[in-house]
Amino acid sequence: MSSQKKVSSGNTTPSGLAGLASPLNDQQINLLQQISDLSPQQLAWVSGYFWGLSQSAAPSAVTPIAQAVSAVAAKPAGKLTIIFASQTGNAKGVAEALEQEAKAEGIAVQLFDASDYKGKNLANETHVIIVASTNGEGEAPDNAIELHEFLQSKKAPKLPNLQYGVIGLGDSSYEFFCQTGKDFDSYLAKLGATPFIERVDCDVDYDASAAQWRKQALEKVKDALSAGVEADVVQLPVAQLAAGHALYTKQKPYAATLLTSQKITGRDSGKDVRHVEIDLAGSGITYQPGDALGVWFENSGELANQVLAKVGLSGVESVDVDGESLSIHSALVSKFEITSSNPQQVEKFAQLSGSKKLLKLVEEKDKLREYAGNTQLVDLLAEKQTKLTAEELVGLLRRLTPRLYSIASSQTEVDEEVHLTVGLVEYDVKGEKRFGGASGYLAQRLEEGEQVKVFVENNNNFKLPADDNVPVIMVGPGTGIAPFRSFIQERDNRGAEGKNWLFFGDRTFTQDFLYQVEWQKYLKSGLLTKLDVAFSRDQAEKVYVQQRILENAAQVWQWIQEGAYLYVCGDANRMAKDVHQAFVAVAEQEGKMSRDDAEEFINDLRKAKRYQRDVY
């Protein structure tokens, strides 16, 4: 091809525009030619900036080209790349907050979902921050599996020029606390990258520690990336920044109204499962099938009194919470977690109380985790009667965090409502009833017509296929059925032609078949192509959903060969693992593969987002 510049309408166009009729005047052409020596990353930035301007109707006194060219010319070449590995949205939220804070500091920044980031590009980066949650037993979140594996492989590039930071999110009650964050830290270091800030491992109540780490990280990054002449950051039009941004968030929830909390298990069931409907009218809140609803709850006032009695407090003592003076009773009800315990809490109370039993337990980490996972605060305090001040009690406690529930409705069906399937956590301790915090709030204490603070947590790792002709296989025992009610409503209202197969399981057919009438209706209409159930206590030998999958191995494999998407929702500890092994066994048996090849095949489905899980 000829490199000769083409003259059109009296304008000399840059070589990249050769052959195109230019709508630009001479001054604009001259300005545009100034970008010819920009780096690829700067060109990408300018491209995105121009696109944003093209979508905005707002006029500007400054020509877009002049504004963009002067801004990029003044900015240093370096940028901060933020990558989030997120399962439920917490890591994504921290990453988005970091992005906004970086912009406010004038730092060039770009944000990536781990599933959209090519690991080989790390070789071209100068500064990267990874925000990583941990899934299951130390596993990477679904959106980060590929990047996690790539960094361990021989294909991973050497990274001598990369400086990085890692923030891990997790739950210290679990053995593999923040394991994914630790993994990324280790992998990057082995590839020759240098940490510019020490990794932080954040617990369940991560807001304060994450905010402090972000501030420190940006102070270090700003020094490194602002060596050139500083210029004002050129923002995309506000409409572009706000696109897709939630009106209400974890920090600013919406005060919705409880419409109903109806028990949907039988009178003789050993479980209390509620169908909960919440009114969102006028909020403008939207959600998609697969998303979760965050619920801020209040603890039981009666339970707060029991806790206070254990440590010799009346409840009127004052404590300072975020600069606000509250009675200790009010603080326990609305600000702190009192329906569970954790290893750090047990260890602290062991020191305060001098309990020999607890001090011995602290030395045995496995037993400590098991104890903390099965013991509420009030029962921990009962181990040894110990008087505490209000400040000492608060020092034992984690901050209250919202609970996430898989949404059980589609807005194409219920409009300005959101539905949940809530299993009441309920058990006995020495003859006394214990209840879960959020489930007890929704099922027992919150009255119809009262307000409940909520927000939508998007889950891009659990979404219906865009193609309505693709078959889907859904595995959701117990309350894991919730998102599949949403899926079926959505496919019904979209007129989707793809086949739908549901595997459901619980204890008994007569008492625990959640939404039975709805599933029978969908089965009769043909929308639900196939329904297989496993009720574990309806026969002498217990039967579970994974066995139903194996019994239908040939047909499951046929659907997979037809491009079916696989979805699993529910218990992560046993069910999800057993179902995963069932899918591997199907691939091994029907696909005539070795066990290792079958495992790789199923994991490849996960990477391709054809095998998605919402487990807890």
From Swiss-Prot:
Entry cofactors: FAD; FMN
Domain Flavodoxin-like: 80-218
Record field: catalytic activity: hydrogen sulfide + 3 NADP(+) + 3 H2O = sulfite + 3 NADPH + 4 H(+)
GO cellular component: cytosol
Pathway linked to the protein: Sulfur metabolism; hydrogen sulfide biosynthesis; hydrogen sulfide from sulfite (NADPH route): step 1/1
GO molecular function: flavin adenine dinucleotide binding; FMN binding; sulfite reductase (NADPH) activity
Positions annotated to bind NADP(+): S536, R537, K542, V543, Y544, V545, Q546, D578
Keywords, ordered alphabetically: Amino-acid biosynthesis, Cysteine biosynthesis, Electron transport, FAD, Flavoprotein, FMN, NADP, Oxidoreductase, Transport
Cofactor note: Binds 1 FAD per subunit. Binds 1 FMN per subunit.
Listed Pfam families: FAD_binding_1, Flavodoxin_1, NAD_binding_1
Domain FAD-binding FR-type residues, every copy: 251-465
Binding site for FMN: 86-91, 133-136, 169-178
NCBIfam families listed in its UniProt record: cysJ
Assembly and binders: Alpha(8)-beta(8). The alpha component is a flavoprotein, the beta component is a hemoprotein.
Name by which UniProt lists this protein: Sulfite reductase [NADPH] flavoprotein alpha-component
Organism lineage string: Bacteria, Pseudomonadati, Pseudomonadota, Gammaproteobacteria, Vibrionales
